[in-house]
């Protein structure tokens, strides 16, 4: 491939025709991968900055890697902000400040499309069939809140299918976590009262709620309904206890507190969530390699990326100002189709104290993060020396597979780096045929059936095919769970794709004992390491993570396939008989545990059909226990 100009000369040539208006520009590398997306109030002026002599090292590296430059004209700065945020999210350019951990926060969902609404944890977009409360910063916090709610209000948490199949109360009723509406232990009217009380509690109308409960308790007492009055009394006590644990603030109602701190080319942004005056937890976000980036730039990038996915409060309270604040507000409002949003930076008062608290938490989080990086970098240096790598590995990919005699086969890829395991980059490769019926084996694809090497060949072929479109995710080192034969397969697939990635195969030693692992590399004799060496322990941790991830996904796929098909695919068991079985026994598990005689008692199930069902389900149980 021949390119006439690149880098600084390319930018100079583009400046000549660049317009003097707002817009977005993209820098692309030699393989036409987007490496940077930027916005500008005036495109010509912004591009001119890249040919100055006082640029930092990061910008110089970016320019040196630029072989193509494209720009898009926008009607306004706000439109440029919006487009820039969308393109960064789409292309994830390596020279941009990226929000890598952008998973959605969990909520508590109260389903309202059922006579007896369900209370459960929920992730995702707002739905029309329920009301969401949150967001919560972690699963722990939402689970703790749900547990408290179930103790106090005893609303159901089961699925509609499970609810509809019950013929007797489940364990939740026995441990006083549910009123068992599924079998008529509570009527619709009384259940609706509980639903309203849950709403009041989650919207922090607790004073009003407690007053209403006190009145109800007195009313029941005057009617000599002492058992019901005692239950209301216990509910009031439980609510008071929960309130003591979670202080409700008057100073903020619906806000995100955001503080940014900086140390050693690393930023941490701590987000504390407050809804209805109640703290819903906080979570840190880290940004690295931000050489010469300012607090304002990092915060602006963060806000525009963060609020593309997360719920926007009515107020964002920060410890640092940003450039073009009004434009950022307008962009966030347009992204989320909202009309009410303010961003403030308080310098005194209660809100300033909350910001300072978030800043202290951010500093602590950043210090812990940097300690983790330092420790992992030291280990990575040992890995570099051990395998004679050209540089400290940035990305290590570990591969393993799991199956039972070729059934439910999966291959997995686990990724590790200086910040530890990068779970967002984990991948699962399904290696089984999708055509599964009870009574027939789940077949591997023809080219890999019963062949461990064939499975690895399939996984690597798919991985390298994808790598052609993701050159920025090229691993520094690959570790494969296997021995000498696997070494040959890896080399064969690499040669086919023209790849030259350092790799090592790691096999269990004598009697498959941990600590006796053998390492296989091209052109070297098989060798082992002292099991007490830090680098050996690290390699074992990597291998075990891949192994556990493979087993988890194998079992998940096996359980899902069998559970779906165990009843659905038995000849003679249609929807009516399946429903009859579930209604009679109360759950799928109870059907599996039933004897032939018990199965035959269900209306529509003959003795011969009961025998067939019993045999199929027991085959499933034997697989689950293997």
From Swiss-Prot:
GO terms for molecular function: DNA binding; excinuclease ABC activity. SMART domains: GIYc, HhH1. Residues 207-242 form the UVR domain. Keywords: Cytoplasm, DNA damage, DNA excision, DNA repair, Excision nuclease, SOS response. It is found in: Cytoplasm. Pfam families: GIY-YIG, HHH_5, UVR, UvrC_RNaseH, UvrC_RNaseH_dom. Interacts with UvrB in an incision complex. The UvrABC repair system catalyzes the recognition and processing of DNA lesions. UvrC both incises the 5' and 3' sides of the lesion. The N-terminal half is responsible for the 3' incision and the C-terminal half is responsible for the 5' incision. This is UvrABC system protein C.
């Amino acid at each position: 491939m021949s390119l006439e100009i690149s880098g600084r000369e390319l930018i100079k040539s583009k400046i000549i025709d660049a317009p003097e208006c707002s817009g977005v520009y993209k820098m692309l590398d030699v393989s036409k991968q987007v490496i940077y997306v930027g916005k500008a109030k005036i495109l010509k002026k912004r591009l001119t900055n890249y040919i100055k002599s006082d640029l930092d090292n990061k910008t110089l590296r970016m320019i040196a890697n630029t072989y193509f430059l494209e720009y898009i004209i926008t009607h306004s700065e706000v439109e440029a902000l919006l487009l820039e945020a969308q393109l960064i999210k789409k292309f994830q350019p390596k020279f941009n400040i990226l929000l890598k951990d952008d998973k959605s926060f969990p909520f508590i969902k109260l389903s309202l499309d059922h006579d007896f609404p369900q209370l459960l944890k929920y992730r995702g977009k707002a739905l029309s069939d329920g009301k969401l409360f949150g967001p919560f910063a972690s699963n722990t916090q939402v689970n703790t809140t749900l547990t408290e709610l179930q103790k106090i209000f005893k609303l159901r948490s089961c699925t509609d299918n499970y609810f509809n199949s019950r013929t007797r109360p489940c364990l939740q009723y026995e441990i006083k976590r549910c009123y068992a509406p599924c079998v008529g232990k509570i009527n619709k009217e009384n259940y609706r009262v509980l639903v309203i009380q849950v709403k009041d509690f989650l919207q922090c109308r607790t004073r009003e709620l407690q007053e209403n409960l006190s009145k109800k308790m007195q009313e029941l007492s005057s009617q000599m309904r002492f058992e019901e009055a005692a239950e209301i009394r216990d509910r009031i006590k439980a609510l008071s206890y929960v309130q003591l644990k979670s202080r409700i603030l008057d100073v903020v109602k619906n806000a995100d507190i955001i503080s940014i701190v900086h140390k050693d080319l690393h930023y941490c942004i701590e987000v504390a969530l407050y809804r209805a005056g109640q703290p819903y937890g906080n979570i840190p976000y880290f940004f690295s390699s931000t050489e010469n980036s300012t607090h304002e730039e990092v915060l602006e990038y963060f806000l525009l990326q963060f609020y593309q996915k997360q719920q926007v409060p009515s107020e964002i309270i920060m410890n640092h100002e940003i450039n073009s604040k009004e434009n950022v507000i307008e962009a966030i409002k347009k992204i989320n189709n909202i009309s009410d949003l303010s961003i403030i930076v308080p310098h005194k008062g209660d809100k300033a104290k909350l910001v300072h608290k978030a800043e202290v938490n951010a500093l602590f989080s950043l210090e812990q993060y940097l300690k983790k990086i330092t420790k992992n970098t030291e280990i990575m240096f040992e890995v570099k020396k051990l395998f004679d790598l050209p540089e400290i590995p940035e990305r290590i990919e570990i591969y393993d597979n799991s199956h039972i005699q070729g059934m439910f086969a999966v291959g997995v890829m686990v990724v590790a780096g200086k910040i530890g395991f990068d779970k967002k980059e984990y991948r699962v490769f399904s290696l089984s045929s999708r055509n599964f019926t009870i009574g027939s084996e789940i077949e591997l694809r023809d080219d890999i059936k019963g062949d461990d090497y064939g499975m690895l060949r399939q996984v690597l072929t798919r991985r390298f095919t994808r790598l052609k479109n993701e050159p920025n995710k090229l691993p520094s080192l690959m570790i494969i769970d296997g021995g000498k034969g696997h070494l040959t397969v890896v080399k064969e697939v690499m040669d086919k794709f023209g790849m030259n990635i350092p790799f090592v195969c790691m096999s269990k030693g004598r009697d498959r004992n941990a600590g006796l692992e053998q390492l296989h590399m091209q052109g070297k004799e098989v060798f082992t390491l002292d099991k007490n060496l830090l680098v050996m322990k690290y390699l074992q941790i990597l291998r075990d993570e891949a192994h556990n991830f493979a087993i988890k996904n194998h079992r998940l796929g096996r359980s899902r396939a069998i559970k779906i098909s165990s009843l659905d695919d038995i000849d003679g068991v249609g929807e009516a008989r399946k429903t009859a079985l579930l209604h009679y026994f109360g759950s799928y598990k109870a059907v599996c545990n039933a004897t032939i005689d018990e199965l035959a008692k269900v209306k529509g199930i003959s003795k011969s059909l009961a025998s067939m069902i019993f045999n199929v389900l027991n085959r499933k149980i034997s697989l689950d226990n293997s």
